């Protein structure tokens, strides 16, 4: 809360029978405000916009799974949990009117979020597989266990859909924060193939991305 400059304004406790709860359970509800002049949502997404991803995907799912199941993973592979409000605020302060949508690729991962955007906004989406950052350790685990990193949960990433005229500026802002140091342009919205997400693969083909059918790993968040 301190890192995100969030105030904890109230709390509550519950009394349960002895032995029913052996650890602390925490549940939170956040309340925020939408700044004046900011209009962000699926209704703003149209064809011809750029899609930016703030960093590498899959770290959180694989790190948590490794701890849960005792996998011997690299010490460098850790959850990506991080407060993003300061980074996002910096983008909105500078080019807020040119930002159409912000989404968090949490449960269901990047693939599910992109498909939801295509459906809700009635646009087509094309993304480049080679542009999507995936750390080597994550890709290795996915290769061994048969997971698709596009559908792994993330806890410290954001997808931004912006006007092409501000893409370079948005990337510069994101790169100035540790949480956005690996931010990249991954694709565009289209006026064709409405409701579909096409992944341009490394070998030159196109793979259609759909919603996550079922969790690849046990629920982690």
PLM region spans:
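Helix-biased detector of long, well-ordered alpha-helical tracts
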Residues: 1-221
